[in-house]
Structures are given as structure tokens and as C-alpha cells.
Amino acid sequence: MPDVVALAAELLSINSSTGAESGAVDFVSKWLVARGWNVTIQEVSRGRANVWASRAGRGVTLSTHLDTVPPYIAPRLDGTRLLGRGACDAKGIAAAMLVAADRLAAAGEQRVDLLFVVGEEKGSDGARAANRLAPTSRFLINGEPTESKLASGAKGSLRVTVRTRGRAAHSAYAHLGESAIVPMLKLLPTLETLDLPTDAILGETTVNVGTLKAGTEANIVPALAEAELMFRLVGDVEPLRKQIDRWAKGRAELEYGSYIPAQHFHTIPGFDVAPVAYTSDIPLLGRWGTPLMFGPGSIHVAHTPDEFIEVEELRGAVDAYERIVKTLLSA
């Protein structure tokens, strides 16, 4: 059987930033074909593709993403840790899934599929494409760094752009203009007055003012100010949208952007369980079966210069994926 740490290091040595995943796709597909899997390469866009590997189907699909955020960071072993871009998000997870599925197949279990998508870190176009395939699995185990716990659910997200307008003028005659920044600075602190929903499992809805843009030069009264908000959702979005509409009415313009609903996931006995605050491809893979989320590593080091995964946890993830699959198939 292949060594999961060596396999993860091989995957990490391939630069597969979002939009340039072809090297990782080629590596994974060849690895699977060499081990007797039926492999489907699904084109997502020019030069980019998902990998779907199957045998008998009608069971459990192990899935994660092959793309990473930039910049590329080469892998290295440092004591008990494997470091590098994608170590925990999510190439280490992909390696653990590959080895677990291969061990199951070698033991005669044919009801395991593998799905590796591109584009998760930016727009999830790979998952959207994968949901147009014709899977037969009953369960989907999505791999994200959950610290080797089964996720009980995941917060959703809602992007909102807020705009305030003024009237441009030369700053020497500022009284002839109207700064768009002033009403924005008055409005944003009142976000604290919103009655944000809570959920017994997912916790509190949160809001982050992610960007604030206004003006072009210090000697110009700015005519436009723009803030981008990110709400992390724990329930139905419509009551929150109505609150936001009332909050901004008469004071700002709103533009609603991407929306991902909050999710509750299937769990099984024998594992620690906890919710996660981040989103994933799960809402876009509805045809792949009842969702679970599990993976080694911590989201708190993902996307950082020192991203890592503990070698012991990575090895343990192979056993954990096998155990989850066997439990689901016996249900």
C-alpha cells in the first residue's frame, strides 16, 4: 500500500493554484488508472478538469478539492509536521482519501467512489460542474480540515455591498460638495444594532466589514463610498435580508452578492463532533448523496505561509476514512 505522507508530499510538490490545476489532475488521474479505477475526466473549463473514479458505485463518495490558494509553497518535512501549500487544505486530505479508498478496494469493497474537483477556492466552478454528472452514491464525505472531527454543520455566507453617495468637489471648496465617506462612517457602526440570528448547533450569525473603498485623491471630496460585508449565516437568509434592507433604507444602496445556505451534516457515532464556520463545496454537490464533512488538519493554519499537517494525524485520517465508509455502507 502507498505511504500517505509520501503521496501527500508528491501532491504538494505540484503547483495547483486555482485556475492552474492541470498538473495535480494529471497526477491523480494517472495514479488511479494505474490501480484499476474507472476514471472519468470532466472538463470544467479549458485546461481544467475534475476527476471522478469509481468501481461499482451505489455507496460512498470521498471528495475534496485539488486547487489551492496562491502562492505556491514547496513541501518539506519538519519533525512531526508536513508543511507546504495545501498540506491541510486540501492535498493532505486528498492523499488520505486516495490511500483509504485504495485499501478498501484491495479488500474487496467496490462501493467507493472518489471525486476531486477544481476551483473550490474561488467560485467553486468544479463542484458546479460535478453536480451535472450522474453519480449513484448514497453518501458524500467532503474533505476539509476539521481537526479530525465530524462536522455537525457549517455556517453559510452572504455577501453584501453597501454604497453611499455624495457630490464631488475640489477640497479647497469642500462646502460645494458632499463627502460620501461621512454617511458611510455613521452607518457601519450601527451594524451592531442588527438582531442577528443564532442556532443551537452553529452558534451566532456574524458580520465582517471586509473592505472599505472611497475617494481617489485627498484634494477631492469623494462622491462614492463602498463597503463589502460578509455575513456568516446559521439559518434562513430571508429574515436577515429584510433586516439589512431596513437597516440601509434611506441611508445607503445595497447590492446582494453570493449566497451559500447554512448546512447541517450527517454524523455517526464514534467520532468527536463540532460545527465549522466556513463554507465548502457541499451545497453545490447535492446529487452526490447525504453529506458528511471530515478531514485532518486545522483551518486556522490553512492559507498561511506556514500551512502544515501533523504526520500522525494524516496517517490517522486514512484509518478514519475507512472506518466512516464501512459504517455508512453497513447502515
Task: Label the model's feature ranges.
Residues A95-R159, D199-A200:
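Acidic/histidine-rich catalytic neighborhood of metal-dependent amide-processing enzymes
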Residues R46-R48, S124, Y278-T279:
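Structural motif corresponding to alpha-helix initiation and N-cap regions
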Residues S22-D26, A94, R241:
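Short, surface-exposed alpha-helical segments at coil->helix boundaries
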Residues M1-A87, E109, M293:
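Acidic/His- and Gly-rich active-site-bordering loop/insert found
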Residues L62, G79-G123, V162-T164, A174-L194, ...:
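Alpha-helical metal-binding/catalytic segments enriched in His/Glu/Asp
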Residues V60-L62, I141, R167:
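Residue-level marker for buried hydrophobic side chains located in beta-strands
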Residues S16, A20, A34, T40, ...:
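Metal-dependent amide/peptide-bond hydrolase catalytic core
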